[in-house]
Swiss-Prot record:
Highest taxon, organism lineage: Bacteria
GO MF annotations in UniProt: rRNA binding; small ribosomal subunit rRNA binding; structural constituent of ribosome; zinc ion binding
Family: Belongs to the universal ribosomal protein uS17 family.
Name under which the protein is recorded: Small ribosomal subunit protein uS17
GO cellular component, one term: cytosolic small ribosomal subunit
Keyword set, alphabetical order: Antibiotic resistance, Ribonucleoprotein, Ribosomal protein, RNA-binding, rRNA-binding
One Pfam family, short name: Ribosomal_S17
GO biological process, one term: ribosomal small subunit assembly
């Protein structure tokens, strides 16, 4: 059994909560009948201890123990700040 920690990259879509952000993860899924690749989005609640992220930032997150009912991911680093 491997204990590999999952890490993902996504874009911040909300930062209105205190010490929390919502990150959208985009992935492509092949349609089972037609074969076309469709874009699917998953929104994850992420713990941001220092409130350093803003809307539009590209961030790297990793899985952790459950911190609340919906938060089980934590911020690793900000890959790219949003251009305003």
């Amino acid at each position: 059994m491997t204990d590999k920690i999952r890490t993902l990259q996504g874009r911040v879509v909300s930062d209105k909560m205190e010490k929390s952000i919502v990150v959208a993860i985009e992935r492509f899924v092949k349609h089972p009948i037609y074969g076309k690749f469709i874009k699917r989005t998953t929104k994850l609640h992420v713990h941001d201890e220092n409130n350093e992220c803003g809307i539009g930032d590209v961030v790297e997150i990793r899985e952790c123990r459950p911190l609340s009912k919906t938060k089980s991911w934590t911020l690793v680093r900000v890959v790219e700040k949003a251009v305003l």
